[in-house]
Design a protein with these regions (language model features):
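Hydrophobic or amphipathic alpha-helical targeting/insertion segments
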Residues: 77-83, 88-117, 143-158, 162, ...
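Hydrophobic cores of alpha-helical transmembrane segments in multi-pass integral membrane proteins
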Residues: 19-39, 68, 72, 80, ...
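Membrane-interfacial, low-structure loops and terminal tails that flank and connect transmembrane helices
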Residues: 2-13, 287-310, 466-480, 613-621, ...
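Non-cytosolic membrane-interface motifs at loop->transmembrane helix junctions
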Residues: 428-439, 513-522, 581-592, 659-664
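Perimembrane loop-to-helix junctions flanking transmembrane segments
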Residues: 53-56, 341-354, 656-659
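Membrane-interfacial helical/loop segments at transmembrane boundaries in membrane proteins
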Residues: 341-347, 421-432, 512-514, 518, ...
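Post-cleavage N-terminal segment of exported redox proteins
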Residues: 2-61
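Soluble extramembrane regions of membrane proteins in the secretory/endomembrane system
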Residues: 42-259
């Protein structure tokens, strides 16, 4: 950056106003989130000291439930099935299937106390016989039961629902009706046996990390979790601790009025807010940009030692990316051939929960390393080619430390799941929480690596005492610039990661609280800190290549960050609708999560404008990098906006959709499409800068890979996610969530499970080509840089 860049004060009154609005918004949002945190702790489902039958026999205790939660995490069951709809979609949802079994066995016990067969009356001209979660309710004709039987059956169903709903979890000692107590004993036996029984037809091998006592306690935790979904809150007699989720009408779980009301209010609010944001864009951002342009990155400077050393980061990104695709391919195959992988028995060697654990963490690793390396490469260029002493050595150290943490953590994950790491599973094994499976020791080291990245970015952006003092003076006088925001984004990433380590030295007794903090990392990383970094870095690149002025770039970033904080922080609530938190998460989550769509609309508008600028340039060296960056803006809007915030976040939609293949569709298109493509675009930017002004930079492999990714994503959507996800949503509505998540349901759609393969082939071909392209470009000699040649500068056509 030039001396003028460092000293020129901000003279844009609109930017000055937006800075203050951003500050107030950020403080207010996190203050509200703090208040909501207090309420979540206060209103989480309580754990009675004991559940007993009427004779005083203890069925399970609070200690059993807490130990069972530890067993659930230790065995990483969240990466085989799910709890409260959170986790893997391969196995059953333990909460829903257990709830249905409790209803079935309670009803059978009630029926056996008399002589009435266990049927339930269904709407219309049919009755439904309650079965297990792996079998849809069976329709029978009215003639199948006499009027007296039907009346008795309805009475038994009503009694079963009343007894389950009347369980008062606020009591220190819960005395259960005989029928419910007998049902719990039956489910305890079933679950304990299932956890220790090989079932290759379901892709399940016994949880090696669970001993007999811990298996029974894990069953107790699952049963308790199921009870929280049907037991009513004392202050809301029509609402369970999970807002009546999952949808299981057989036990009386249907959407609440709260869910229905706030869905429609949020839709109205969204359309109003979208109109307001579009007006702001037209009024203050969408006008001719006649301000002076800066072209700091348009000049190819001699590479600094640290820039040269980032090449090995890009190689690791490529390798982890390929490994992630391999794990994903095996997982996808497991849905349609659960016993074997093309005749090879992998379930014992590579159990599904380990594959999923790796597949979830791998994108975080390669996207994170891509951003870390790109940031470390671009920062010295931002500083004008200057570098602090020892920066190259520190970049090397960070690489090897990061590589050690990644490899050791993944090995620990595997050994923990396989039961090799027993007593130290929490610290060195697998924590069993989706996306943050790393053992706590590895989490701490990972946090240290992130902190080191921020420190290195700080040294790279302001390498001398003079530049640091000037930047500090700018910041404290309110002249906050894009360079400050880029560094603040790195701090934001690591600060939010801290909350995934609460409590630091052990597990929390409540899954509701554990999952609350998990979403602080997963959601706030993606929807707030990742978006923060993406917006700030993308805007700086545009500005420093002379495509937009600093004034317009900073205006755009401030406005987008305001919307990102509004939607990203409090929008966390849409993940907390059904996990046992207070009912206020429904209005809070839906209103603010719909705001997440608004910055994505701005991203699309800006992407269109950027595309026009690049197309209007006669020469632009970074067209390949910007192809990926524009692609990330598109998929951010489609994956996170259309398939996520614009539809699935609505409470009434989410009530039925939560935990289905439509969520997988949202996850794949938004994580890779939005942030993966951005990471790859930044890497291609660095590779082009690294090649120098006179190098022959072949863009063809990168372009082919880009279109392979896009075609692969589209094929996944229309040949896999939609053909399974939409019928699955129908199945939830017609038969309940447990049936829609059963293997019996999936077996009806084996053809569409197989149709995942074409998209995998196309996508993987792009990945292989791109990784080869990375290697070739890193081996390419760097061009002459003795003179600063502004070849990267866009030149007006004509």
């Amino acid at each position: 950056m030039t001396e003028r860049d460092l000293t020129t004060p901000s003279i844009d009154p609109i930017s000055d106003i937006l800075k203050w609005v951003l500050l107030v918004t950020a403080v207010a949002c996190f203050a509200l989130l703090g208040w909501a945190t207090v309420l979540t702790y206060k209103h989480a489902p309580p754990q009675p000291q004991a559940f007993t039958d009427r004779a005083g026999n203890v069925l399970m205790t609070a200690d059993d439930i807490v130990a069972g939660k530890g067993g659930f995490q230790k065995a990483d069951l969240m990466d085989y099935g799910s709890i409260y709809g959170m986790g893997s979609y391969f196995g059953e949802d333990y909460t829903a299937s257990t709830l249905v079994r409790l209803g079935v066995l309670t009803k059978q016990s009630l029926a056996n106390s008399g002589e009435t067969p266990p049927r339930t009356k269904a709407p219309g001209n049919q009755s439904l016989a309650i079965t297990g979660p792996g079998t849809p309710p069976k329709a029978t004709t009215p003639g199948a039961a006499s009027p007296a039987e039907a009346l008795s059956d309805a009475a038994i169903t009503a009694t079963m629902q009343k007894q389950l709903q009347a369980i008062d979890l606020t009591q220190s000692k819960v005395v259960l009706p005989d029928a419910v107590a007998q049902a719990i004993r039956g489910v305890q036996t079933e679950l304990t046996t299932k956890l220790n029984t090989v079932d290759l037809s379901a892709g399940w091998v016994p949880a090696k990390s669970l001993d007999p006592v811990l298996r029974k306690q894990t069953a107790d935790f699952i049963i308790y979790s199921a009870i929280t979904t049907v037991a009513r809150r004392p202050d809301h007699p029509k609402t369970s601790w999970t807002e009546n989720w999952p949808y299981e009408p057989s036990v009386g779980n249907t959407p609440t009025t709260n869910t229905f009301r706030w869905t429609w209010i949020s839709f109205c609010f969204t359309f109003f807010a979208m109109g307001f944001v579009l007006w702001l864009y037209r009024a203050y951002l969408d006008h001719p940009d006649d301000e002076p342009m800066e072209r700091g990155l348009a000049e190819y400077r001699t590479l600094t030692p640290s820039q040269v050393k980032t090449g090995k980061y890009f190689i690791v990104v490529a390798l982890v990316f390929l490994a992630s695709q391999g794990a994903g391919a095996i997982m996808a195959h497991s849905y349609y051939e659960r016993e074997y992988f093309y005749g090879i028995q992998l379930n014992y060697i590579l159990p599904f929960n380990f594959l999923r654990s790796f597949h979830l963490q791998a994108p975080i690793i390669w996207i994170g390393l891509g951003w870390i390396a790109s940031g470390l490469f671009i920062a010295p260029a931002i500083a004008g080619g200057r570098e602090a002493k020892g920066q190259g050595l520190l970049v090397d150290i960070l690489f090897w430390v990061s590589l050690f943490v990644v490899v050791a953590a993944l090995v620990g994950n595997y050994l923990g799941i396989q039961g090799v790491i027993d007593k130290g599973w929490f610290w060195f094994g697998n924590q069993g929480l989706s996306y943050i499976q790393l053992g706590r020791f590895w989490q701490i080291l990972f946090f240290v690596a992130l902190l080191s990245w921020s420190g290195l970015m700080f040294r790279a952006l302001w390498p001398s005492r003079d530049t640091l003092m000037q930047a500090t003076r700018q910041f404290w006088t309110g002249n906050i610039r894009l360079e400050h925001l880029i560094w603040a984004a790195t701090i934001n990433v690591e600060v939010l990661y801290i909350f995934g380590m609460i409590p630091l030295t052990g597990i929390h007794k409540s899954f509701t609280i554990t999952d609350f903090w998990r979403w602080w990392v997963v959601h706030l990383w993606v929807e707030q800190s990742f978006e923060f970094f993406a917006v700030a870095m993308s805007a700086y690149l545009l500005m420093s290549l002379g495509l937009v002025s600093r004034k317009l770039a900073e205006r755009s970033v401030y406005l987008e960050l305001i919307l990102i904080f509004l939607g990203g922080v409090l929008g966390t609530g849409h993940h907390l609708y059904w996990g046992g938190g207070p009912s206020m998460w429904v209005p809070l989550g839906t209103m603010f999560s719909f705001i997440e769509v608004l910055p994505l609309v701005l991203l699309i508008l800006e992407a269109i404008s950027q595309h026009r600028l690049i197309k209007g340039a006669a020469a632009f060296d970074y067209s390949l990098a910007y192809l990926y960056i524009l692609g990330s803006a598109f998929w951010n809007f489609v994956g996170a906006g259309v398939f996520g915030g614009g539809t699935l976040n609505a409470p009434l939609v989410n009530y039925y959709e939560h935990g289905t293949f439509l969520t997988l569709n949202h996850a794949h298109t938004s994580l890779f499409g939005a942030f993966g493509l951005l990471a790859l675009g930044l890497i291609y930017f660095c590779l082009r800068y690294r090649a120098g002004p006179d190098a022959k930079f072949n863009e063809t492999p990168g372009r082919i890979a880009f279109w392979c990714y896009n075609i692969g994503l589209v094929m996944w959507i229309f040949l896999h996610f939609f053909p399974i996800g939409w019928p699955q949503l129908d199945a939830v509505y017609e038969h309940g969530f447990a049936w829609a998540r059963s293997q019996a349901f999936y077996d009806q759609y084996l053809f569409w499970q197989w149709m995942r393969m074409p998209g995998d082939v196309v996508f993987s071909a792009g990945a292989l080509l791109m990784c080869w392209d990375f290697v070739m470009k890193l081996r390419q000699p760097r061009g002459d840089r003795d003179q600063l040649l502004p070849r990267a500068m866009p030149v007006a056509a004509g």
